[in-house]
Design a protein with these regions (language model features):
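Helix-loop boundary and gating motifs at the non-cytosolic
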Residues: 2-49, 204-243, 309
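Juxtamembrane intracellular "pre-TM" segments in multi-pass secondary transporters
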Residues: 1-3, 177-212
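Symmetry-related core transmembrane helices of the 12-TM Major Facilitator Superfamily/SLC fold
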Residues: 159-175, 357-375
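A late C-terminal transmembrane helix in Major Facilitator Superfamily
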Residues: 325-353
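Structural signature of the two symmetry-related core transmembrane helices
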Residues: 71-85, 269-284
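Hydrophobic core of transmembrane alpha-helices in multi-pass small-molecule transporters
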Residues: 14, 83, 93-111, 213, ...
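Helix-to-loop junctions at the C-terminal end of transmembrane segments
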Residues: 54-68, 151-152, 253-266, 351
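Intracellular juxtamembrane helix-capping segments at the cytosolic ends
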Residues: 27, 107-123, 306-320
Length: 381
C-alpha cells in the first residue's frame, strides 16, 4: 500500500511513541508487579538505557545511504517485536535483563533513523517537521492515559499486553510504502560522511552533546520512578497516566507552535530556556506532591524536553549533510540513552534512601547545562 510520505512519517512517529508512552511511564510498575526490587529495577532500566545508547550509537550510523533508511526501520521493528514477545516467556531477572537489552538495542535506533529520514525528506521537499513530529506526542498522550486506565482495571499485566499490540502496529506501518522514497547517494553527488572522531574534534559539537546529555539525563528520576513515587503519595495509576499525558499535551502545543514561537531563536538560547525549566521543574517535583503543583511540574515538560529537542534538531539541521546521520545518532545515544542510563542506575540505588531527594539531584544535573551551551548563531526557519 502506497501512502503520502509525510503521512508515512507521521504514522511512524505515532506508533513508535504509542509504544514509548507505555514503556517509559509504566515499565517500572510492570517490573515491580513481577516482584522485582527497586534496586534491580534501576539496574534493569539502566541496562536497557545503556543498550539504547549502544543501539543509537552503533546501529543507526551503519545506514549511510538514505535510500536504505526505510528498510533499516523495517528490520528494527521486526526484531523489536521479537524481543517484546520475549517478555511473555519468563520473569527471572536474568531473562528480563537479556530481553530488556535486546528490546532497547533495536527499538532505540528507530528514532534517529526516523529523524534522519525526516531530515532527508526535508531536503527533497518542504514540510513542517514540528507538525509531523507532534503526532508522536499525541500518541504518547493517548497511550499513557489509556494504559493508566487499563492498569486500574486489570493490574500491571495490562502493560505488557498493550505494548505487544503497539509494537506490532509499528511493524505494520513500516511495511507501508511512502509515495516519495528517500534519495540515496549517486556517483555525481556523493556525500562525504564524517566520522565520530571528526565530529567530536569540534568544540561546539562537544559542548552541544554534553549540554543535551545533562538536560535529558536529568529526566532519569522522572522516567524511572515518578509513577512509583506518585502512587506511594496516594495517586491512582489512572491519575499517574493523566499526569504523564498532561506533560505531553504541553509538548504537543510547543511542537505545533514551534515555528511561530521559536522561529528566530538560536539553539543556544533554546538550551538556556530548557536548562532554566529543568532546574525549576525538578526542584518543584522534589518538594511538593500536591496536585496543583504536579500540574505545573508536568506543564514544564514542554520546556525540559521539547525545547531541548527542538534545540537539538536546530543545531543538527544546520550541519552539513554528511554530518547529520552521525550527529543525530550521537545525540540519540548520548542524550536520550547514555546520560539517562547513567542517572537511572544511580537513581535506582539511591531512591530507597532519598525518595523525593532524587528529583533535587536531577535539578543539580540540569544546572551545569546552562553554562555549557555551544556558541551558535540564530537561523531563520
Amino acid at each position: 500500500m502506497v501512502i503520502r510520505s509525510t503521512r508515512w512519517l507521521a504514522l511512524d512517529y505515532f506508533t513508535y511513541f504509542f509504544s514509548y508512552g507505555i514503556f517509559l511511564p509504566f515499565w517500572a510498575i510492570w517490573l515491580q508487579g513481577e516482584g522485582i526490587e527497586h534496586d534491580m529495577i534501576g539496574v534493569l532500566l539502566g541496562a536497557g538505557l545503556i543498550s539504547r545508547f549502544l543501539g543509537s550509537l552503533l546501529i543507526a550510523p551503519t545506514v549511510k545511504d538514505p535510500a536504505k533508511l526505510i528498510f533499516a526501520l523495517r528490520i528494527s521493528a521486526l526484531i523489536t517485536f521479537v524481543f517484546i514477545v520475549g517478555f511473555t516467556l519468563g520473569n527471572h531477572w536474568a531473562w528480563l535483563l537479556f530481553v530488556m537489552v535486546g528490546f532497547n538495542l533495536f527499538f532505540s535506533p528507530m528514532m534517529p533513523l526516523s529523524d534522519a529520514l525526516a531530515g532527508t525528506w526535508q531536503k527533497q521537499f518542504p514540510f513542517d517537521y514540528g507538525k509531523i513530529r507532534v503526532w508522536g506526542s499525541i500518541a504518547f498522550i493517548i497511550s499513557s492515559a489509556l494504559t493508566g486506565e487499563l492498569i486500574s482495571i486489570w493490574g500491571h499485566r495490562a502493560i505488557l499486553i498493550t505494548i505487544l499490540f503497539s509494537v506490532f502496529s509499528t511493524l505494520l506501518v513500516t511495511l507501508l510504502r511512502p509515495s516519495i522514497m528517500p534519495v540515496g547517494e549517486t556517483k555525481s553527488a556523493k556525500v562525504d560522511v564524517v566520522s565520530f572522531k571528526q565530529l567530536l574534534s569540534e568544540k561546539s559539537v562537544r559542548r552541544f552533546l554534553l549540554c543535551v546529555a545533562l538536560l535529558q539525563g536529568a529526566h532519569a528520576g522522572y522516567y524511572s520512578f515518578s509513577a512509583i513515587y506518585w502512587e506511594n503519595a496516594g495517586y491512582s495509576a489512572s491519575v499517574v497516566g493523566y499526569l504523564w499525558s498532561l506533560g505531553v499535551v504541553a509538548e504537543v502545543i510547543i511542537f505545533t507552535l514551534s515555528n511561530q514561537l521559536f522561529r528566530r531563536w538560536s539553539a543556544r538560547n533554546l538550551l538556556l530556556l530548557s536548562g532554566i525549566c529543568g532546574v525549576v521543574r525538578w526542584g518543584l517535583m522534589g518538594t511538593y506532591t500536591s496536585l496543583p503543583v504536579l500540574i505545573i511540574v508536568q506543564i514544564l515538560h514542554c520546556g525540559t524536553f521539547t525545547v531541548c529537542h527542538l534545540a537539538a534538531m536546530r543545531f543538527i539541521g544546520a550541519r552539513k549533510e554528511g554530518e547529520i546521520v552521525r550527529l543525530q545518532a550521537a545525540y540519540s545515544a548520548l542524550a536520550m540513552g547514555g546520560g539517562i542510563a547513567v542517572m537511572t542506575v544511580i537513581a535506582g540505588f539511591m531512591y530507597d534512601y532519598l525518595h523525593s531527594g532524587i528529583f533535587w539531584m536531577m535539578a543539580l544535573v540540569a544546572f551545569p547545562a546552562i553554562f555549557l551551551r555551544p556558541q551558535v548563531k540564530a537561523h531563520n526557519y
